[in-house]
């Protein structure tokens, strides 16, 4: 019979050697890392291997993988072999793969059919037939005054609502110009409260029309170059929120952007610097033109009509005029001219006749972002095929819907015919996505980004090019979704909101900082939120230096 002291010693030895030791229960069920690699290159495999090895070593158990996985069913043999290597690495490190896919906001399905893009309306655009072609009739009332910067008094330009600091920040330059004899130069940005160096003019437009603004710009040691912008505003917000890249030093370059006038009769065009610090910027030869049929969309939900000038006669495509398409369709760089309508030999349309053309077109914003239409049935057929591919090659238990930042929609005929709010359209879309996933993988757990469902974030009206209001979207989605909140500033309100509705949640933390203070703030909120499943290391810039410390912090 052993003594009590010896018995205690044996117990300590057994526990210390792991014979009776039990692992400490995990603090969170979901401990993930976000990874973006599409396996188009062999080196991507080694990069993912390194990340998941680090993740596994430091207690993480999931990889949210952005890698073009919605098209996995079309991958070639080499790419599928790389996929198997990644799957093997994840198994070795006990890392679960969670695919993220089907981004409405960032163009899911456009590679399959670009016509699935959200459509902006153009109504009753005038065309004139000359011979066997009809072309847009330029709006005689469209005018941008003093676009060549030739009319001025001192350093004040005529025709413009304002330009910052005439004689201090903005100057007439008769030595450097692109056309004519003068240009507008900006410098001395650091001497202004906000580093502004802008010029703005308000112009009259026709509602629901397509326009292009162009200008010539030149830079010298501009800093930061990212401060350069061209913006078109309606009464409340930007209607052409497009990011224009301009080198810090550059000779004259032409810059152009396409915009919709939406429902407005007047728009404000801004060009210049916001937050400039150093260098010089020149502008010359501003121009605005009405466009037509550029990036025209052809799908059931974006009908095109050609009528007589009085609207009484509707002409038939394929009979009175040849099928219409933009053969130079390009989201990022729309064509500079306008497609013509080709009149057929036996058409009812006569030479010299005026026509009215109504259609829908696609427009990219920011850095080329294009949203897709949630009301077009073909999109859901595409997702069904996509889900089958994901099931076949990954068969994941968890799926993640990339349904963030949906910045266009609600304006095409397909959306209007439903008589639903944008919140209802979004909720219906998410419900269908979830059903498609569970048809392919019964019992799957589905996660989703929070912002378009969160009144503290993007679930509201007046959102970019969206025609409608996302309010109430959270009332129309499956209650067993896991909501991934990522807005750090509103983390407490957001997590409390979804928890109060009975949803499970996940925290999207980190976001490429130089330390883990963001993560520490999230951990505090996570620990106070009922039904929160865990936290994710979310890097968009592929910064994984702090991943080990992150894993140790959430153990």
PLM feature segments, named:
Residues 1-9:
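Bacterial N-terminal signal peptides that target proteins for export
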Residues 11-21:
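Hydrophobic h-region of N-terminal signal peptides that target proteins for export
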Residues 30-141, 358-476, 481:
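Aromatic-lined carbohydrate-binding surfaces of glycoside hydrolases
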Residues 129-345, 349-352:
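Extracellular and organelle-lumenal recognition/adhesion modules and their flexible linkers in secreted
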Residues 345-365:
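Small/polar beta-strand repeat architecture
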Residues 457-519:
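Glycoside hydrolase catalytic-domain groove-lining segments
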Residues 509-555:
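Substrate-binding cleft of secreted/luminal carbohydrate-active enzymes
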């Amino acid at each position: 019979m052993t003594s009590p002291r010896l018995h205690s010693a044996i117990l300590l030895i057994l526990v210390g050697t792991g014979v009776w030791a039990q692992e400490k229960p995990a603090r969170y069920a979901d401990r993930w890392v976000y990874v973006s690699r599409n396996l188009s290159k062999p080196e991507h495999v080694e990069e993912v291997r390194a990340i998941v090895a680090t993740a596994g070593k430091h207690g993480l158990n999931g990889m949210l993988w952005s890698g073009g996985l919605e098209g996995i069913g079309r991958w070639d043999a080499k790419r599928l072999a790389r996929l198997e290597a990644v799957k093997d690495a994840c198994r070795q490190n006990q890392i679960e793969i969670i695919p993220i896919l089907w981004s409405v906001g960032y163009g899911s399905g456009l590679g399959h059919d670009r016509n699935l893009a959200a459509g902006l309306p153009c109504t009753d655009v005038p065309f004139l037939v000359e011979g066997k072609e009809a072309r847009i009739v330029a709006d005689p009332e469209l005018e941008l005054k003093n676009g060549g910067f030739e009319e001025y008094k001192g350093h004040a330009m005529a025709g413009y609502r304002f330009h910052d600091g005439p004689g201090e920040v903005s100057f007439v330059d008769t030595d450097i110009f692109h056309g004519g004899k003068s240009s507008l130069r900006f410098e001395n940005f650091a001497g202004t409260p906000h580093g502004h160096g802008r010029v703005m003019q308000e112009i009259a437009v026709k509602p629901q029309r397509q326009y292009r603004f162009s200008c010539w710009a030149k830079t010298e040691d501009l800093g930061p170059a990212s401060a350069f912008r061209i913006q078109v505003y309606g009464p409340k917000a930007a209607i052409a929120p497009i990011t224009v890249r301009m080198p810090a030093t550059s000779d004259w370059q032409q810059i152009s952007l396409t915009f919709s006038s939406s429902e407005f009769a007047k728009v404000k065009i801004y060009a210049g610097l916001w937050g400039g610090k150093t260098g010089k910027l020149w502008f010359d030869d501003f121009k605005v033109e009405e466009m037509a049929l550029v990036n025209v969309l052809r799908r059931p939900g974006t009908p095109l009509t050609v009528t007589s000038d009085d609207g009484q006669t509707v002409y038939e495509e394929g009979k009175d005029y040849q099928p219409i398409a933009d053969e130079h369709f390009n989201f990022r760089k729309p064509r500079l001219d306008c497609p013509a309508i080709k009149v057929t030999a036996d058409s009812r349309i006569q030479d010299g006749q005026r026509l009215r053309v109504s259609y829908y077109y696609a427009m990219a914003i920011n850095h080329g972002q294009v949203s897709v239409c949630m009301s077009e049935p073909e999109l859901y057929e595409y997702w069904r095929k996509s889900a089958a591919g994901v099931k076949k090659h990954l068969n994941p238990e968890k799926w993640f819907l990339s349904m963030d930042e949906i910045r266009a929609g609600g304006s095409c005929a397909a959306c209007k015919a439903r008589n639903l709010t944008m919140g209802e359209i979004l909720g219906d879309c998410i419900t269908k996505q979830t059903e498609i996933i569970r048809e392919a993988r019964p019992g799957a757990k589905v996660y989703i980004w929070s912002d378009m469902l969160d009144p503290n974030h993007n679930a509201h009206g007046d959102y970019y090019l969206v025609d409608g209001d996302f309010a109430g979207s959270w009332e129309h989605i499956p209650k067993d979704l896991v909501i991934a909140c990522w807005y750090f500033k509103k983390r407490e309100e957001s997590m409390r909101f979804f928890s109060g509705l009975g949803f499970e949640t996940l925290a999207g933390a980190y976001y490429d900082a130089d330390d883990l203070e963001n993560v520490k703030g999230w951990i505090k909120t996570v620990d106070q939120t009922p039904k929160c499943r865990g936290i994710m290391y979310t890097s968009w810039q592929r910064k994984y230096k702090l991943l080990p410390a992150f894993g140790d912090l959430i153990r």
